[in-house]
Amino acid sequence: MSEADIPDPVAPQRVTPAMRARLERIVGRAPEVMVKITGRTKDAGHLKSHLEYIMRNGDLTAETEQGSLMHGREGLKDLQLRWTDDTVLDDKRRRDGSVSVNIILSMPPGTDPIAVKDAVRAFAIETFEANHDYVLVQHLDDKHPHVHLTVRSQGYNGKRLNPRKADLATWRERFAGELRLRGVAAEATPRRTRGKVRKHDKGPVVALRRRGVVPDTDKGAREEVVRAAKAGTAGARPWEEKARERQAKIRAQYLDHARELERTGKGSDRALAMKVREFVAMMPDPETRREQLIRELSWMARRTRPDQDRAPNCGDTGPGAKTR
């Protein structure tokens, strides 16, 4: 739980300064940080290859938890030797255990890359310095300024790094906070806070769609929807009902905050309350991928029926339209 989520102990319904600041960022659509675990290295050879990749075979400089800068091919070799030697000595690692956890921290195009790297450095110090070796390398060959952070799984205390979903949420909050300290507008809200119920599609799937290729996952999802429709079992699923209930509560909470802001009588609070109401009004319909497919396939089925089977003068709303 972040400071912005902690209610006022005296007046629990009051919008605290931290909550107000976060509302400003959310309705102002501050850029969302990305903190993602890209993978884990499994052995010394895998680790060496990963370090070669993030350092571009020595063309990029790496920075360690001690602040040491590793330059060029020699720096890359020194880093590889140090980490692989430690891997051999790590007799507590299971044969299928990881050697490192590989993380990427990124911001949208146009973000100051110096601020991004400084924020990642501060994040790494606070999160890992006390218990883990790590190395960070910034990449500037992409429109999104980002830093690769590779952390040794084996901690100084003998415990292994095994981040969970809650850890990633904390890491996002921390990274966003470090960016704000450096003057960069940044937020780390969950998708559901922005009215989204669907997970982001994986990179390879998105790439296939851009090339006009239908991914196997899309084919399978469509086939499942068609089978369910034929069997008469295409109704709402329990998790979809829960998602809608959750979204209703989130939107109600936003409106509660808006009413509380309006009660203060301050012009700035009334202005923010109006923005909050507009934000809620613009939130997307909490539609899952399955529900979207059902709607699209239903529309396509109506379009392909003979003209006499369609009601006259009713007009087509299309797969993306909403009826009143």
How would you describe each model-predicted region?
Residues M1-R324:
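N-terminal nicking endonuclease/strand-transfer module with a His-rich metal-binding environment
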